[in-house]
Amino acid sequence: MPGSGTIVEHKPMTDRTTDFAETVENAQNWKLTLAYDGTDFSGWQVQPGEPTIQGELQAALGRVTDETPLPQGSGRTDAGVHALGQVTSFPLQAPIPPANLLRALNRTLPASIRVLEARIVPAAFHARHSVVAKTYEYRVFRDAICPPSLARYVLACSSPI
């Protein structure tokens, strides 16, 4: 689209091989990959009285499984920030097939949060500590008028950068 540009930043992470297995008895370690529109959220991390991605996911897990583990994210996004592949991990004791958990969470979560993948992973996996790389994408729309359909997803800037 004319006037748009994309800046992609790739940050390699340090290797961490420590075992971060949860100590919940008879629990399986889960990994979810999420996509979300963060416009209406106060970031990733639970904040009292504020809607957050982590809080919505924890509440949805409670409604689906009767368990409320605190999902650990591969990073914490700020208020209004979107994600196309945020990874989270948590322990669950409920015996549920991955496809069923994915489907149930997507029916329960707000439309602005979607689970793209649900997998049972080794106990040593931890979304934050096992990450090896992160990619950040900044979209700048360089024109005098930004189309409303893009306004939530770009920085509108008509001045030289």
Where are each of the predicted segments found?
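Structured-RNA-binding interfaces characteristic of tRNA pseudouridine synthases
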Residues: 5-161
